[in-house]
Amino acid sequence: ATGQIVAYTDADVRVEPEWLTYLVEPFFSSSIAGSGGPNVVPADDPWLAQCVARAPGGPSHVLFDDRIAEHVPGCNMAFRRDVLVALDGFNPVFTKAGDDVDLCWRLQARGWQIAFAPCALVWHHHRSSLRAYWTQQLGYGEGEAWLKPLHPEKFVGRRVLWQGHIYSPLPFVRSLRHAKINVGVWGSAAFPSIYRFDAHPFAHLPHSIRWQLSGLVFFIVGLVLLWTPYRAAGVIALAAGAGALGTTLAKCIKYALDTEIDGLPSIARLPRIVSRFVYRWTVAWLHFLQPFARTHGRVLGFLSPPRGVSGVRDDQAAPVPLPRLQLWTTLRLFVGGSVQDQFWGESWVNPDELLQKMTDWLRSSRAIHIIELDDGWRPHRDFSVAAGRWVWLDLRALVEE
């Protein structure tokens, strides 16, 4: 490409004649390095593709706010050519997925920004078979596994730590409750937010691969124990496994029931009521299937890491890994013990300034949701960090001359 702006799309995408006009518009009104827009499934896609579009794991934009994005999908994005040259283009190691995420993260590590162009919409044909959907999610999982060594600061364990937010039509975590909006006294609250960020940490647990595999193991072990003298233990294990899997299935069914399908046509010659049942059953099945495909891909990516590419590229910012606690340290803290860490510096460090920088960094990392500062009545700590629903870590700083 020789132009000043390079646009990207996929072979399974249809664009409107005005697409490029809207996509490049942010480049002329702000000093941004890239832009991207939404992708929507076309109405003429097959019925299974419509279900896949309503299943988890599809390509989506991640937004910091209404104008700036953390990530835009590879099927609908554009970048300045000089920025691509400075970044040495896409990383060739990502042959299945993850190339767009890697480029967006490296771009932002340089201090550049990506604009979101909501009018630059493309029609994205989704996978039209279960095998194709499984293969897609397999590739996404493999791409995630290869992203982790290149961007360790973007991960907490195996989970991607997005700084922005995903505005998705999927019911997902919030589908099991009806959120209320604070409208103020007599409706006086201006512009109340309809988005919630306080989802219970256990809300997504039944949809995780650990939960599903644990439930399956308990169920199988329970069946085996029923044929042994340990029938009581078998009944307990069987009940635990059935309860875990039943919870997952119930949530998947609830997701499917909350999915909008009213505008979809009937399937072939099936009656409308039967078509709606097939739509919802397929969406529920895809919700159940997706974590297994992603995990399978992550395992494959971990077992077959890319060759010939270093862990950190020259155009990346130096990785700043998030702190991790070793097992022994975790046990000491769990029983009420303490851990001391110290460092030496050539210049004086103001403890208030140090603590402020630490709390600012923790808040910006999105890994920590709740930080409680000392109110002056607790001399044993300077601030506390919520490490879970019932676990708090207290931190105290001391400066010695």
Region spans (language model):
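Conserved nucleotide-sugar donor-binding
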Residues: 2-3, 73-87
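Active-site-adjacent helix/loop segment of glycosyltransferases
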Residues: 114-222, 250-296
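Short, flexible, basic/aromatic active-site loop/helix in glycosyltransferases
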Residues: 37-38, 52-70, 85
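Short aromatic/hydrophobic "clamp" motif used to bind/position activated sugar donors
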Residues: 6
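Active-site acidic Asp-centered loop
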Residues: 9-11, 91
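Acidic metal-phosphate-binding loop of nucleotide-sugar-dependent transferases
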Residues: 13-14, 94
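Acidic donor-binding loop at a coil-to-helix junction in glycosyltransferase catalytic cores
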Residues: 96-103
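Conserved donor NDP-sugar-binding/catalytic core segment of glycosyltransferases
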Residues: 14, 18-49, 113, 125
